């Protein structure tokens, strides 16, 4: 049986979750990452994606995050999200609205670096929309 550790998911609006869990799968910018008890200390950035949490009771919860940072220690993990909502609370058109707003901004962007970031954001949001719509 896997050891438990404390996990907190925090957005600027609220504390979404603070409980003992057995594992958390996070969309790190380097790739999907599974965090378990006694994980090596790590700090990583989070890209838009789905965070899957397996609680100590065995219940699985999924949250959509729109970027942030994760601070991982052997005894716990704190994910500070730019924005986050439980998957079941996500309005289906929210991702489409974000994609369309980024596309409109891209049309008027002048700097290459800004265009590149917007294109990357659109790609991530489009992928996330596909993942969320499958569930």
Curated annotation (Swiss-Prot):
Under InterPro entries, the record lists: ATP_synth_F1_dsu/esu, ATP_synth_F1_dsu/esu_N, ATPsynth_dsu/esu_N
Annotated membrane topology: Peripheral membrane protein
Record key words, sorted: ATP synthesis, Cell inner membrane, Cell membrane, CF(1), Hydrogen ion transport, Ion transport, Membrane, Transport
Asked if the record carries the keyword Kinase, the reply is no
Oligomeric state and partners?
F-type ATPases have 2 components, CF(1) - the catalytic core - and CF(0) - the membrane proton channel. CF(1) has five subunits: alpha(3), beta(3), gamma(1), delta(1), epsilon(1). CF(0) has three main subunits: a, b and c.
Q: In its UniProt entry, what is this protein called?
A: ATP synthase epsilon chain
Q: Where in the cell is it found?
A: Cell inner membrane
Q: What is the lineage of its organism?
A: Bacteria, Pseudomonadati, Pseudomonadota, Alphaproteobacteria, Hyphomicrobiales
Q: Name one GO cellular component term.
A: proton-transporting ATP synthase complex
Describe the function of this protein: Produces ATP from ADP in the presence of a proton gradient across the membrane.
Gene name in the database record? atpC
Origin, by domain of life? Bacteria
| Family named by the database record | Belongs to the ATPase epsilon chain family.
One GO molecular function term? ATP binding
Which Pfam families does the protein's record reference? Answer: ATP-synt_DE_N
Location, primary (coarse class) = membrane
């Amino acid at each position: 049986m896997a050891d438990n550790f404390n996990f907190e998911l925090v957005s600027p609006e609220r504390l979404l979750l603070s409980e003992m869990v057995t594992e958390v799968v996070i969309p790190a910018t380097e790739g999907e990452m599974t965090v378990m008890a006694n994980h090596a200390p790590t700090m990583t950035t989070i890209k838009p994606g789905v965070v899957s949490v397996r609680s100590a009771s065995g219940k699985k919860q999924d949250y959509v995050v729109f970027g942030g940072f994760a601070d991982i220690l052997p005894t716990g993990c704190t994910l500070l999200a730019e924005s986050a909502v439980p998957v079941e609370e996500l309005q289906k058109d929210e991702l489409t609205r974000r994609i369309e707003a980024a596309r409109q901004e891209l049309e008027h962007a002048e700097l290459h670096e800004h265009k590149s970031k917007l294109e990357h954001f659109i790609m991530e949001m489009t992928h996330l929309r596909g993942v969320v719509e499958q569930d």
